[in-house]
Amino acid sequence: MMPNVAPNSYYLNIPNANSTSTTTSSIFSDLNKEYESKIKEIEEYYIKTLLNENTDNDDSSSSEGHNINETDILSEYSPRPSPWLPSKPNCYHPLGDFKDLIISDSRPTNTLPINNPFAGNNNISTLATTEKKRKKRSLEVEINPTYTTSAFSLPLTAENLQKLSQVDSQSTGLPYTLPIQKTTKLEPCRRAPLQLPQLVNKTLYKTELCESFTIKGYCKYGNKCQFAHGLNELKFKKKSNNYRTKPCINWSKLGYCPYGKRCCFKHGDDKDVEIYQNANDGRSKDTALTPLPTSLAPSNNDNITNLSKPRNLHTSVKALQRMTW
Protein backbone atom coordinates (compact mmCIF):
# COMPACT_ATOMS: atom_id res chain seq x y z
CA MET A 1 0.00 0.00 0.00
CA MET A 2 1.29 3.42 -0.97
CA PRO A 3 1.05 6.12 1.67
CA ASN A 4 -1.28 9.01 1.06
CA VAL A 5 0.77 11.73 -0.57
CA ALA A 6 -0.38 15.26 -1.16
CA PRO A 7 -1.17 15.99 -4.82
CA ASN A 8 1.54 18.64 -5.07
CA SER A 9 4.20 16.72 -3.16
CA TYR A 10 6.11 15.71 -6.28
CA TYR A 11 6.62 19.37 -7.16
CA LEU A 12 8.98 19.75 -4.23
CA ASN A 13 11.99 18.57 -6.20
CA ILE A 14 11.28 21.03 -9.08
CA PRO A 15 11.23 24.81 -8.69
CA ASN A 16 7.79 26.40 -8.84
CA ALA A 17 7.01 28.08 -12.16
CA ASN A 18 4.91 30.76 -10.47
CA SER A 19 7.60 31.77 -7.98
CA THR A 20 8.75 35.34 -8.06
CA SER A 21 12.46 34.50 -7.83
CA THR A 22 14.28 33.58 -11.06
CA THR A 23 17.19 31.83 -9.38
CA THR A 24 17.21 28.03 -9.17
CA SER A 25 18.76 25.86 -6.50
CA SER A 26 22.15 24.43 -7.32
CA ILE A 27 21.20 20.96 -6.11
CA PHE A 28 18.52 20.22 -8.78
CA SER A 29 19.85 22.26 -11.67
CA ASP A 30 21.63 19.30 -13.25
CA LEU A 31 18.53 17.15 -13.02
CA ASN A 32 16.39 19.74 -14.79
CA LYS A 33 18.86 20.05 -17.65
CA GLU A 34 19.00 16.30 -18.15
CA TYR A 35 15.22 16.07 -18.02
CA GLU A 36 14.75 18.82 -20.61
CA SER A 37 17.31 17.26 -22.94
CA LYS A 38 15.57 13.89 -22.72
CA ILE A 39 12.19 15.47 -23.49
CA LYS A 40 13.68 17.19 -26.56
CA GLU A 41 15.06 13.85 -27.77
CA ILE A 42 11.64 12.24 -27.36
CA GLU A 43 9.96 15.06 -29.30
CA GLU A 44 12.50 14.85 -32.13
CA TYR A 45 12.07 11.10 -32.32
CA TYR A 46 8.30 11.32 -32.61
CA ILE A 47 8.44 14.12 -35.18
CA LYS A 48 10.72 11.95 -37.34
CA THR A 49 8.49 8.91 -36.96
CA LEU A 50 5.37 10.92 -37.83
CA LEU A 51 6.96 12.41 -40.97
CA ASN A 52 8.15 8.97 -42.11
CA GLU A 53 4.84 7.28 -41.28
CA ASN A 54 3.89 6.70 -44.94
CA THR A 55 7.21 5.10 -45.82
CA ASP A 56 7.01 2.89 -42.77
CA ASN A 57 3.55 1.65 -43.85
CA ASP A 58 4.91 0.73 -47.31
CA ASP A 59 7.85 -1.20 -45.83
CA SER A 60 5.90 -2.74 -42.96
CA SER A 61 7.57 -6.14 -43.43
CA SER A 62 11.07 -4.71 -43.01
CA SER A 63 10.22 -2.36 -40.14
CA GLU A 64 8.49 -4.87 -37.84
CA GLY A 65 11.73 -5.98 -36.22
CA HIS A 66 12.93 -2.42 -35.63
CA ASN A 67 9.85 -1.11 -33.76
CA ILE A 68 10.53 0.12 -30.27
CA ASN A 69 8.16 -0.45 -27.40
CA GLU A 70 6.61 2.79 -26.21
CA THR A 71 6.51 1.73 -22.55
CA ASP A 72 10.26 0.97 -22.56
CA ILE A 73 11.07 4.43 -23.95
CA LEU A 74 8.80 6.02 -21.36
CA SER A 75 10.41 4.09 -18.53
CA GLU A 76 13.91 5.04 -19.71
CA TYR A 77 13.51 8.69 -20.70
CA SER A 78 10.80 9.87 -18.32
CA PRO A 79 11.59 8.96 -14.71
CA ARG A 80 9.37 11.79 -13.46
CA PRO A 81 6.21 13.24 -14.94
CA SER A 82 6.47 16.70 -16.43
CA PRO A 83 5.14 19.48 -14.19
CA TRP A 84 3.12 21.15 -17.02
CA LEU A 85 1.04 18.05 -17.89
CA PRO A 86 -2.22 17.76 -15.89
CA SER A 87 -2.03 14.33 -14.34
CA LYS A 88 -2.47 12.49 -11.09
CA PRO A 89 0.49 12.19 -8.70
CA ASN A 90 2.85 9.26 -9.20
CA CYS A 91 1.17 8.50 -12.59
CA TYR A 92 2.85 8.28 -16.00
CA HIS A 93 1.22 9.09 -19.33
CA PRO A 94 1.74 6.83 -22.33
CA LEU A 95 3.44 8.17 -25.43
CA GLY A 96 0.08 8.31 -27.19
CA ASP A 97 -0.63 11.59 -25.37
CA PHE A 98 2.57 13.12 -26.77
CA LYS A 99 1.65 11.80 -30.20
CA ASP A 100 -1.79 13.42 -30.09
CA LEU A 101 -0.31 16.75 -29.00
CA ILE A 102 2.30 16.76 -31.78
CA ILE A 103 -0.23 15.71 -34.42
CA SER A 104 -2.69 18.42 -33.37
CA ASP A 105 0.03 21.08 -33.61
CA SER A 106 1.61 19.97 -36.88
CA ARG A 107 -1.42 18.84 -38.92
CA PRO A 108 -3.77 21.47 -40.47
CA THR A 109 -7.39 21.41 -39.38
CA ASN A 110 -8.97 21.05 -42.84
CA THR A 111 -6.92 18.05 -44.02
CA LEU A 112 -8.19 14.51 -43.61
CA PRO A 113 -5.84 11.82 -42.19
CA ILE A 114 -4.63 9.35 -44.80
CA ASN A 115 -3.39 6.07 -43.33
CA ASN A 116 -2.78 4.29 -46.60
CA PRO A 117 -0.87 6.16 -49.36
CA PHE A 118 -2.57 4.06 -52.06
CA ALA A 119 -5.97 5.02 -50.72
CA GLY A 120 -5.23 8.73 -51.28
CA ASN A 121 -6.07 8.61 -54.97
CA ASN A 122 -9.37 6.91 -54.20
CA ASN A 123 -10.23 9.59 -51.67
CA ILE A 124 -9.40 12.35 -54.17
CA SER A 125 -11.56 10.71 -56.85
CA THR A 126 -14.47 10.37 -54.45
CA LEU A 127 -14.14 14.01 -53.41
CA ALA A 128 -14.11 15.10 -57.07
CA THR A 129 -17.24 13.09 -57.84
CA THR A 130 -19.07 14.50 -54.84
CA GLU A 131 -18.15 18.05 -55.86
CA LYS A 132 -19.41 17.42 -59.40
CA LYS A 133 -22.69 16.09 -58.05
CA ARG A 134 -23.07 19.17 -55.88
CA LYS A 135 -22.45 21.46 -58.85
CA LYS A 136 -24.97 19.56 -60.95
CA ARG A 137 -27.52 19.82 -58.20
CA SER A 138 -26.91 23.55 -57.87
CA LEU A 139 -27.29 24.07 -61.64
CA GLU A 140 -30.45 22.04 -61.91
CA VAL A 141 -33.68 24.03 -62.00
CA GLU A 142 -36.96 22.63 -60.88
CA ILE A 143 -39.60 23.04 -63.59
CA ASN A 144 -43.13 23.67 -62.49
CA PRO A 145 -45.29 21.00 -64.20
CA THR A 146 -48.43 23.08 -63.74
CA TYR A 147 -46.98 26.15 -65.52
CA THR A 148 -48.84 27.23 -68.65
CA THR A 149 -48.06 30.14 -70.93
CA SER A 150 -50.60 32.91 -71.04
CA ALA A 151 -52.61 33.28 -74.22
CA PHE A 152 -51.53 36.89 -74.75
CA SER A 153 -47.79 36.06 -74.68
CA LEU A 154 -47.98 33.82 -77.77
CA PRO A 155 -46.69 35.14 -81.13
CA LEU A 156 -49.31 36.68 -83.41
CA THR A 157 -49.73 33.94 -85.99
CA ALA A 158 -52.90 32.76 -87.71
CA GLU A 159 -53.09 29.58 -85.63
CA ASN A 160 -52.61 31.42 -82.33
CA LEU A 161 -55.25 34.00 -83.26
CA GLN A 162 -57.73 31.21 -83.96
CA LYS A 163 -56.91 29.63 -80.61
CA LEU A 164 -57.41 32.95 -78.83
CA SER A 165 -60.79 33.47 -80.47
CA GLN A 166 -61.90 29.95 -79.52
CA VAL A 167 -60.76 30.32 -75.89
CA ASP A 168 -62.48 33.67 -75.42
CA SER A 169 -65.71 32.51 -77.07
CA GLN A 170 -65.82 29.42 -74.87
CA SER A 171 -65.13 31.36 -71.68
CA THR A 172 -67.62 34.17 -72.26
CA GLY A 173 -70.13 32.41 -74.50
CA LEU A 174 -69.98 35.36 -76.89
CA PRO A 175 -68.09 35.78 -80.15
CA TYR A 176 -64.65 37.25 -79.79
CA THR A 177 -64.58 41.00 -80.37
CA LEU A 178 -61.68 43.36 -80.23
CA PRO A 179 -61.87 46.39 -77.92
CA ILE A 180 -63.05 49.58 -79.62
CA GLN A 181 -60.44 52.29 -79.81
CA LYS A 182 -61.01 55.91 -80.71
CA THR A 183 -59.11 56.88 -83.80
CA THR A 184 -58.72 60.27 -85.38
CA LYS A 185 -59.06 60.63 -89.12
CA LEU A 186 -55.83 61.64 -90.73
CA GLU A 187 -55.98 63.86 -93.76
CA PRO A 188 -54.56 62.12 -96.79
CA CYS A 189 -51.27 63.74 -97.67
CA ARG A 190 -49.97 63.69 -101.17
CA ARG A 191 -46.58 62.13 -101.33
CA ALA A 192 -44.41 61.79 -104.37
CA PRO A 193 -43.68 58.18 -105.35
CA LEU A 194 -40.40 57.04 -103.94
CA GLN A 195 -37.83 56.52 -106.63
CA LEU A 196 -35.68 53.51 -106.02
CA PRO A 197 -32.01 54.46 -106.22
CA GLN A 198 -30.27 52.96 -109.21
CA LEU A 199 -27.20 50.94 -108.43
CA VAL A 200 -24.25 52.99 -109.64
CA ASN A 201 -20.69 51.81 -109.86
CA LYS A 202 -18.89 54.87 -108.49
CA THR A 203 -15.44 53.57 -109.32
CA LEU A 204 -15.96 54.34 -113.02
CA TYR A 205 -15.13 57.82 -114.17
CA LYS A 206 -18.17 58.86 -116.25
CA THR A 207 -17.44 62.08 -118.12
CA GLU A 208 -19.70 61.50 -121.16
CA LEU A 209 -23.38 60.75 -121.64
CA CYS A 210 -24.43 57.35 -122.93
CA GLU A 211 -25.89 57.68 -126.43
CA SER A 212 -28.18 54.66 -126.21
CA PHE A 213 -29.56 55.79 -122.84
CA THR A 214 -30.18 59.38 -124.00
CA ILE A 215 -31.75 58.37 -127.34
CA LYS A 216 -33.53 55.08 -126.58
CA GLY A 217 -34.01 55.45 -122.83
CA TYR A 218 -32.28 52.22 -121.89
CA CYS A 219 -28.83 50.67 -122.05
CA LYS A 220 -28.01 46.98 -122.25
CA TYR A 221 -24.95 47.39 -120.01
CA GLY A 222 -26.94 48.78 -117.08
CA ASN A 223 -24.87 50.10 -114.20
CA LYS A 224 -21.75 48.54 -115.73
CA CYS A 225 -21.82 51.08 -118.53
CA GLN A 226 -18.79 53.35 -118.63
CA PHE A 227 -20.89 56.33 -119.74
CA ALA A 228 -23.21 58.49 -117.67
CA HIS A 229 -26.91 57.62 -117.57
CA GLY A 230 -28.27 61.08 -116.90
CA LEU A 231 -26.82 64.33 -115.62
CA ASN A 232 -26.71 63.08 -112.02
CA GLU A 233 -23.96 60.61 -113.00
CA LEU A 234 -22.09 62.97 -115.29
CA LYS A 235 -18.72 64.12 -114.00
CA PHE A 236 -16.71 67.03 -115.33
CA LYS A 237 -13.00 66.66 -115.76
CA LYS A 238 -10.56 69.49 -115.43
CA LYS A 239 -9.10 70.59 -118.74
CA SER A 240 -5.52 71.76 -118.96
CA ASN A 241 -4.44 75.03 -120.57
CA ASN A 242 -3.03 73.11 -123.55
CA TYR A 243 -6.39 71.52 -124.37
CA ARG A 244 -6.94 71.72 -128.16
CA THR A 245 -4.19 74.24 -128.81
CA LYS A 246 -2.23 72.04 -131.22
CA PRO A 247 -3.67 70.93 -134.59
CA CYS A 248 -4.79 67.33 -134.97
CA ILE A 249 -2.62 65.32 -137.37
CA ASN A 250 -5.48 63.10 -138.52
CA TRP A 251 -7.65 66.12 -139.23
CA SER A 252 -4.96 67.94 -141.21
CA LYS A 253 -3.94 64.90 -143.30
CA LEU A 254 -7.14 62.89 -143.72
CA GLY A 255 -9.74 65.60 -143.22
CA TYR A 256 -11.40 63.72 -140.33
CA CYS A 257 -10.50 62.29 -136.95
CA PRO A 258 -11.77 58.91 -135.65
CA TYR A 259 -11.76 60.19 -132.05
CA GLY A 260 -14.25 62.95 -132.83
CA LYS A 261 -15.07 65.12 -129.84
CA ARG A 262 -12.88 62.96 -127.60
CA CYS A 263 -9.78 64.18 -129.39
CA CYS A 264 -7.61 66.49 -127.30
CA PHE A 265 -6.22 68.29 -130.38
CA LYS A 266 -7.70 71.06 -132.52
CA HIS A 267 -9.74 70.18 -135.57
CA GLY A 268 -9.28 72.94 -138.19
CA ASP A 269 -7.92 76.47 -137.90
CA ASP A 270 -8.99 79.16 -135.48
CA LYS A 271 -10.74 81.06 -138.29
CA ASP A 272 -12.78 78.03 -139.27
CA VAL A 273 -13.92 77.54 -135.72
CA GLU A 274 -14.88 81.21 -135.34
CA ILE A 275 -16.85 81.18 -138.62
CA TYR A 276 -18.66 78.01 -137.58
CA GLN A 277 -19.60 79.46 -134.22
CA ASN A 278 -20.68 82.79 -135.72
CA ALA A 279 -22.82 81.02 -138.30
CA ASN A 280 -24.65 79.10 -135.57
CA ASP A 281 -25.05 82.23 -133.44
CA GLY A 282 -26.33 84.31 -136.38
CA ARG A 283 -28.85 81.63 -137.37
CA SER A 284 -30.24 81.40 -133.88
CA LYS A 285 -30.52 85.22 -133.56
CA ASP A 286 -32.16 85.66 -136.95
CA THR A 287 -34.72 82.96 -136.31
CA ALA A 288 -35.52 84.39 -132.91
CA LEU A 289 -35.85 88.08 -133.91
CA THR A 290 -36.88 88.37 -137.60
CA PRO A 291 -40.04 86.64 -138.83
CA LEU A 292 -39.95 84.59 -141.96
CA PRO A 293 -41.27 86.15 -145.20
CA THR A 294 -44.54 84.98 -146.69
CA SER A 295 -42.79 83.47 -149.68
CA LEU A 296 -40.69 81.29 -147.36
CA ALA A 297 -43.59 80.51 -145.04
CA PRO A 298 -43.91 76.77 -144.38
CA SER A 299 -46.65 75.26 -146.44
CA ASN A 300 -45.99 71.60 -145.64
CA ASN A 301 -44.22 69.49 -143.03
CA ASP A 302 -41.33 68.90 -145.43
CA ASN A 303 -40.67 72.61 -145.67
CA ILE A 304 -40.59 72.87 -141.84
CA THR A 305 -37.97 70.13 -141.57
CA ASN A 306 -35.87 71.78 -144.28
CA LEU A 307 -35.96 75.19 -142.62
CA SER A 308 -35.11 73.77 -139.21
CA LYS A 309 -31.79 72.34 -140.45
CA PRO A 310 -28.81 74.66 -139.93
CA ARG A 311 -27.13 76.10 -142.98
CA ASN A 312 -23.35 76.44 -143.20
CA LEU A 313 -22.24 79.22 -145.53
CA HIS A 314 -18.57 78.29 -145.38
CA THR A 315 -16.86 76.88 -148.45
CA SER A 316 -15.63 73.69 -146.73
CA VAL A 317 -19.02 72.53 -145.52
CA LYS A 318 -18.06 68.86 -145.38
CA ALA A 319 -15.07 69.58 -143.20
CA LEU A 320 -17.13 71.64 -140.80
CA GLN A 321 -19.82 68.96 -140.63
CA ARG A 322 -17.22 66.45 -139.55
CA MET A 323 -16.23 68.74 -136.69
CA THR A 324 -17.80 67.70 -133.40
CA TRP A 325 -17.19 69.88 -130.39
Swiss-Prot record:
Q: GO: which molecular function terms?
A: mRNA binding; zinc ion binding
Q: Where are the zinc fingers (C3H1-type)?
A: 204-232, 242-270
* Keywords of the record: Metal-binding, Repeat, RNA-binding, Zinc, Zinc-finger
Gene Ontology cellular component? nucleus
Q: Does the keyword Metal-binding apply?
A: yes
An example Pfam family from this entry, by short name, is: zf-CCCH
Q: In what ranges is there compositional bias, type Polar residues?
A: 292-306
Recount the UniProt induction comment for this entry.
By transcription factors AFT1 and AFT2 in response to iron deficiency.
Q: Positions of the region Disordered? A: 284-306
Membrane-crossing ranges are none
Matches recorded under SMART domains: ZnF_C3H1
Looking at the keywords, is Cell division present?
Answer: no
One GO term of the biological process aspect: intracellular iron ion homeostasis
Q: Name the job this protein performs.
A: Binds to specific AU-rich elements (ARE) in the 3'-untranslated region of target mRNAs and promotes their degradation. In response to iron deficiency, promotes the decay of many mRNAs encoding proteins involved in iron-dependent pathways. Negatively regulates primarily iron-dependent mitochondrial processes including respiration and amino acid biosynthesis.
Q: What is this protein called?
A: mRNA decay factor CTH1
Native organism = Saccharomyces cerevisiae (strain ATCC 204508 / S288c) (Baker's yeast)
- Lineage of origin: Eukaryota, Fungi, Dikarya, Ascomycota, Saccharomycotina
